[in-house]
Amino acid sequence: MDMVTLGSTGITVNKNGFGALPIQRISQEDAVYLARKAYKAGIRFFDTARAYTDSEVKLGEAFDGIRTEVYIATKTAAQNAEDFWKDLHTSLTNLRTDYIDLYQFHNPAFCPKPGDGSGLYEAMQEAKAKGMIRHIGITNHRLKVAHEAIDSCLYETLQFPFSYISGEQELELVNKCKAANMGFIAMKGLSGGLITNSAAAYAFEAQFDGVLPIWGVQRERELDEFLSYIDNPPRMTDDIRAVIEGDRAELCGEFCRGCGYCMPCPAGIEINNCARMSLLLRRSPSAEHLSPAGQAKMKKIEGCLHCNQCKAKCPYGLDTPALLARNYEDYKRVLAGEVKVQ
């Protein structure tokens, strides 16, 4: 079993974290079942957020009575101290607990610090002093903010996208966190569904002893894949290296990661899927994407207002309107039978 310690927090768990964003899409009963199954199999780290609708409520029911046996991380996207306290109290109620193991600022546009005028970090410190939270973390998609968080020495963990299609800049963050004794939580280990080989994804993450990947799970078969890696963790082999190199050749560069920070779109476009449709058509079953419902979603691209809000919000600096246009043209060719996909 591969284990990881999150820096100075002392939180030590097996190298399979449970990402609870997807369970907001399934029923309470199914979500509770999955979370409990994960716990019974040995997963101990569960990551959610105030922004993930009812995800916290579902975890709260799942761990009622066994709270001290799991580590729960959640997040606040509050922009001021008043909203911070509202979020924290709501999360504690939803999770049926009187403390949160790791409380994280959720993708802020800046790195909260004492004296910055927002009152956010001071609120974190007060919550920790009161025993309402045990450790302070930050999540982000921006390299600048991530580096600032590490350099500040104010945070015990950083959660950032990291997968085998990440580049040298993300790897630098991993190494920098290790040097600072700061835990690194890897989100988007499957790159929003574009990486389809979970064994390769796991083997890559397992190379970094200070990294805890959290896998987004909403189906039992997905959970079972990762549970199988607890006792039989995949290792880097020539075959897995070949898979990784093939995916890097296809996926590296300008493509949508599906993070959703561009949403909502004033024209109603489902940007986080439409802007990567060319990849989804080729890396997942295409029938659903080509259905009447899928066609209706893609057709909304024709109503793009070119307001550039999505471009301004993209943490990866993508020209999102242009990316949408390219994906729509490719989609129409696939739909017309001019281009073949599986």
Segments predicted by a language model, with ranges:
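N-terminal binding-site loop/beta-alpha segment at the start of enzyme catalytic domains
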Residues: M1-V70
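Generic structural signal for well-ordered alpha-helices
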Residues: M3, A35, E56, G60, ...
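Conserved, mostly hydrophobic/aromatic
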Residues: L6, F18, F46, L59, ...
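Glycine/proline-rich, positively charged
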Residues: E29, Q79-I185, L190-G193
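Structural motif
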Residues: K37, A41, N94-L95, S152-C153, ...
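Structured C-terminal cap/extension of enzyme domains
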Residues: I43-R44, E172-A186, L190-Q342
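Short catalytic-loop micro-motif centered on adjacent basic/acidic residues
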Residues: R44-A49, A73-T74, R134-G137, T157-P161, ...
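Short hydrophobic/aromatic-enriched beta-strand-loop microsegments
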Residues: E69-I72, Y155-S163, P234-I240
